[in-house]
Amino acid sequence: MAERSNSEEVKLLGMWASPFSRRIEIALTLKGVSYEFLEQDITNKSSLLLQLNPVHKMIPVLVHNGKPISESLVILEYIDETWRDNPILPQDPYERTMARFWSKFVDEQIYVTAMKVVGKTGKERDAVVEATRDLLMFLEKELVGKDFLGGKSLGFVDIVATLVAFWLMRTEEIVGVKVVPVEKFPEIHRWVKNLLGNDVIKKCIPPEDEHLKYIRARMEKLNIKSA
């Protein structure tokens, strides 16, 4: 069973609209781990968050039996190593390494580049969109012949890449630019449908209407025009 003892205490400091927080919820839910969610205000950081993550001062933070772990990719690996049921990383050493590679690629390349679309206009925005599409094409090719980036079932890279499936593709609706058009990325759109068919994913992603309202509000606060 996922829960190894009745005395285990698992808490997650997160924020409901954060893709980095939500990926931890997905992993814990997939593993069947009970946890307490502590919603954080990222604009007014709590003393608890600053105490548990004094280095980065950011969410998410997983607290397992009083011990804090920060950074979402690190937390995901910890969860997989601690609760062995429903593994999200492959057993094969090469495949595990490649899962780590693609996860870092999503966070450090796709996410960082795609978020620059927000606030850009004209030729600057067009250049960012093209750069993002060039990066997304690597995922498009990886998905050929697969139901998920992890193969036949939901895995580590899929959980990480939900920020593409839901956050990026919802943000493009707000900014009025199709970064991931279906005619250019049919495999990614097929993969998104597969994600939406997964009960854990459906349970753990933010409700679309509330999420869109949040994105719009954030953009207004930053004086960024939406479509």
Curated annotation (Swiss-Prot):
The keyword Cytoplasm applies. It is found in: Cytoplasm, Cytosol. Disulfide bonds: none annotated. GO terms for molecular function: glutathione transferase activity. Keywords: Cytoplasm, Detoxification, Transferase. Transmembrane segments: none annotated. Residues 8-87 form the GST N-terminal domain. Belongs to the GST superfamily. Tau family. This is Glutathione S-transferase U7. The lineage of its organism: Eukaryota, Viridiplantae, Streptophyta, Embryophyta, Tracheophyta.
